[in-house]
Each structure stands twice: as C-alpha cells, then as structure tokens.
Amino acid sequence: MNPNQKIITIGSVSLTIATICFLMQIAILVTTVTLHFKQYECNSPPNNQVMLCEPTIIERNITEIVYLTNTTIEKEICPKLAEYRNWSKPQCKITGFAPFSKDNSIRLSAGGDIWVTREPYVSCDPDKCYQFALGQGTTLNNRHSNDTVHDRTPYRTLLMNELGVPFHLGTKQVCIAWSSSSCHDGKAWLHVCVTGHDENATASFIYDGRLVDSIGSWSKKILRTQESECVCINGTCTVVMTDGSASGRADTKILFIEEGKIVHISPLSGSAQHVEECSCYPRYSGVRCVCRDNWKGSNRPIVDINVKDYSIVSSYVCSGLVGDTPRKNDSSSSSHCLNPNNEEGGHGVKGWAFDDGNDVWMGRTISEKLRSGYETFKVIGGWSKPNSKLQINRQVIVDRGNRSGYSGIFSVEGKSCINRCFYVELIRGRKQETEVWWTSNSIVVFCGTSGTYGTGSWPDGADINLMPI
C-alpha cells in the first residue's frame, strides 16, 4: 500500500469513528432529555381530571444511577402513594408475650426534667410505634406538680413521642386534652382530644395536624373516650365515647370518622350496661373493643363495630376469670357472656382482652382489690363458653408488691399477620404514696410471641425516697 492509500485509509477509519462517536453523543443526549421529562409524568391525571391540592406522603424515594461512557444519568422512580390500612391479615398465633419497651420515666425524673403524666397508651403508624400520655402541664421536679392526682384540668395536653423516649421538655404537645385517643389510617394521624368543663366539654378531631371537626358534650356529664388507640379500616376510623354517669346509666356512642370528619354516629346497642375506656383492635372487616363496666360488672363488656353498615353489637367476655379490678376471687367470680355479673361492679380500671378462636387472652392486676401487680394468661373457651376458667400460659409482668394501673392493647401489622401488644401503666405517687405531692407514671410494653420466653417482673422501680417531693 503506497503512502497515499495509507493516508486515505486512515482518514476513512477516523471519519467512521468520529461519526459513530457523534451518533452516540446524540443518543445519550436524547436519553438524558427523555428521562428528565419522564420523571414528571408519574401519576399525572387524565386531561378531564383535576389534580387535588393535597399533601403527598412519600414512602419510597429511590435513585438509580446509570453509567454510559462517563455520562451520569439520574432516574427517579415514581414514589408509591400511601394507602389506607385495611388490617386484612390474620391474627398472629402466639404462645405468650415477650418484653418490648420500658421508658423508666419516674426514675429519670429524679434527676431530669420529665413530664408528669397519666393515662398512657401506644399506637403505631405503618413504620414505627409511638407512646402517648396526658401531661399535667408540668414536669415532676416543679411546684406545679403538687396535687396532680386530679384527672381533668385545662392544662392537660396529649403528649407524643417515639416509643421508648420519655416525655422530656422537647416533647410535642399534640392537643389540649384530659381524655384522648389516637390512630393512624395509613396516611396520617387522627387525634381525638377532649377538654373543657365537666358539664360541657368539647372533643376536637385533629387529622394530619389540622383541626377538622368537633363535637360537644351530649349528656353534660364528663364526655370521655378510650385512653388508648382507635382503629382505622379502609379510611374509616372508629372511636368509642361515653357521656354520663360513671356509676350509673350513661350514654355511649360510636363515632365513625374519615380524615378527621365525623361521618356517622351510632348509639351503643346490645346487652352491655355500662361502657368506658375501651381497648380496641382491628378484627377484619370490623373493629372489636373490650371495655370497662364501672357500674354493674367486673366482667368486661365487648363492643363489636361494623365499619361498613355502622351497626353495633355488645355483650360481655365469657371467661369466669374476670378482668376488672375490684373483683371476687377466681373461685367465686363468674361471667355468662351476655350480661354484667353484678360482682364488685362499682369502680374499675381500664384493661384489655382479645379473642383467639374460642379462647381469650387477657391481662389484669394480680390484686383483686388494688391496682397492684399485673399478669397475663389465656383462658380456654374464654371467648365462647360461659364461665370458663381453664387458665394456661400465665405470665407475671409486675409482681404483686408493686403498683400497676391502666392497661390497653395496640396492634402491629407484620409481613404475614397482625400481632397484639399491650402496655401497662405503672402509677407512682399519690394517693397511695403520700411522701410526695405528685401523681405520675411510667410504662412497660410487651408484644405477642410465637417463641419461648422466661420469667421476670418489670415494675416502675423508682425509690420514692429519692424523688423530688
């Protein structure tokens, strides 16, 4: 090949390579522009629809990086929109309960600024769990903590922290409330907050951080609600509220709420005679609550709520090992599913139970008369057989010598089933402990387990003599 031919050949090859590179650059440019505009096409509405001006909850925000000849292209995957929870999975099969969380609020109050609280509970959004309580508008090491044994003052607010974080000075005050309930519908939190005069209180309904609705007292005698989580199914949340006598006939209503707006109110129906402080859980496709009869029964009332047609059915837990305090001893106590047992019916304490086929899991104070100690167990046939008393899988959560208090249920959705968990309020201070002038609490939390477990006792643990007066 002569020199001229070599020059022509080299020139041709160079021109070909240059052309290929030019085409590749054009392809890269087109791809970059296409991906840049395509990310804005996600979930765009048809031309005949209006895009609603509402906040979007982003669950995932994934960035993929693709390398092409030293050019970086970022492609953003469209975020999946949050969906309402439907709680359609089955209930987890459990053998008992395992320790989950303890906040040690009273012990920490001996040397730090921790809120004075009572009426705690736990509820979870799809990602994490939170603890709630009704604060008294003061920390424990503060003269305002004097006489905080009282339930209803205008200074009480609903506090909210991630589970396991005590209520420190930076805690969010969600609303003004001396009675409350909270739940997450899959998109946002709903808070039901009751405050005001005993004879004319107001319940505010706060959804996604905004006041959406309210309702006033209908019986003019201490409007009150669950003091534990409400339940939302497919966007409809239910909350049980009572107004009227705490030791006689009262007026209980079940409110149905969608994104903070009351859409229906159903009166209590069925055989339950007195219903307060319900502990509710999803039982697809409805909601089931186990409550407190403060008038006639030491057996606990059941309220079944149909979310679709707003119908209500009520009865009592069948187990002859009853769940309220005070109560008769186990050899003398009874329950026949339909009516209050008229045994130690006055007074009572918030508690919980849940069905497991024909059986029932339940928790209660160990003491029959006082809010001290705490135990859980399963009663064979306790959900369906009148006066059933065969107890298995008993666990001590707090030993008899230490104080307990309210307790309630909350539900956690796993990959394949819905687990039931409970918390126990560990009350300290007045009225029983007169060395101090305050009344407050810490909590301990357990969740259902299908595994094995050991034994123990998890009391509050604060030495009252080391506490601020």
Swiss-Prot record:
Glycosylation sites: 61, 70, 86, 146, 200, 234, 329, 402
Subcellular location: Virion membrane; Host apical cell membrane
Keyword field: Calcium, Disulfide bond, Glycoprotein, Glycosidase, Host cell membrane, Host membrane, Hydrolase, Membrane, Metal-binding, Signal-anchor, Transmembrane, Transmembrane helix, Virion
UniProt-annotated binding residues for substrate: 118, 152, 276-277, 292, 371
GO BP term (any one): viral budding from plasma membrane
Cofactor(s) needed: Ca(2+)
The protein's Enzyme Commission number: 3.2.1.18
Classification via SUPFAM superfamilies: Sialidases (SSF50939)
Active site positions: 151, 406
Disulfide bonds: 92-417, 124-129, 183-230, 232-237, 278-291, 280-289, 318-337, 421-447
GO cellular component terms, semicolon-separated: host cell plasma membrane; membrane; virion membrane
Record field: transmembrane: 10-30
This protein's domain notes: Intact N-terminus is essential for virion morphogenesis. Possesses two apical sorting signals, one in the ectodomain, which is likely to be a glycan, and the other in the transmembrane domain. The transmembrane domain also plays a role in lipid raft association.
Subunit structure, interactors included: Homotetramer.
UniProt function note: Catalyzes the removal of terminal sialic acid residues from viral and cellular glycoconjugates. Cleaves off the terminal sialic acids on the glycosylated HA during virus budding to facilitate virus release. Additionally helps virus spread through the circulation by further removing sialic acids from the cell surface. These cleavages prevent self-aggregation and ensure the efficient spread of the progeny virus from cell to cell. Otherwise, infection would be limited to one round of replication.
Record protein name field: Neuraminidase
Chain's gene name: NA
